[in-house]
Amino acid sequence: MKKEFEQIILNLSDEEWEFNGVTHDRQIVRAIVFDDEGYFYFVRVDRDDDFGRAVYIETAGGGVESEEELEIAIHRELKEELGVSVEVLCKIGVVSDYYNLIKRHNINNYYLCRAISVGEKHLTEDEINQYHLSTLKLTYDEAIAEYEKGRELPIGRIVCNRELPILKRAKEILDTYIE
């Protein structure tokens, strides 16, 4: 059953790289995924590209395809990156942030989702070869620690600033409202 909660709306800037304009906006869906045993699911990114050598934690998700509804996109992305089928419980909020290095404005739509079943992932070639995505199953405290570790890197700080408030709000919702 989908419920509605007060959503977080955040507008963040990229303090890591100089702003040189924006060439494109990207609609993105992301999720805090949890299971009935109290674990949260994330992806570990291991990359070496224009953003530098970096290993950090991030929520699963990705770009919304043209004409695609947000909730359809979140189901597709979670199946691809985590191999999970989910129940979407609620929208947590929207975080607007920037990747100045690639002149992109991100509109991140976050959902709270309960894992129903876990199956095979369907990663793209870039997700396998460039970002080396792997699945992490963590407790809430372990996830917080992973995000804090990521603060050592420029891209990790951007991700942490965007996602820690969302993770904390998801935990509040789970602790307060969800059976």
Predicted region positions:
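Acidic, metal-coordinating catalytic segment for phosphate/diphosphate chemistry
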Residues: M1-R30, D36
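A structural signal for short, well-ordered beta-strand segments
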Residues: A31, K91, N109-Y111
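Short, charged/polar surface micro-motifs in flexible loops or helix N-caps
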Residues: F34-Y39, D48-D49, E65, L112-E120
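Active-site-adjacent beta-strand/loop module that shapes the phosphate/pyrophosphate-binding cleft
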Residues: D97-H122, L136
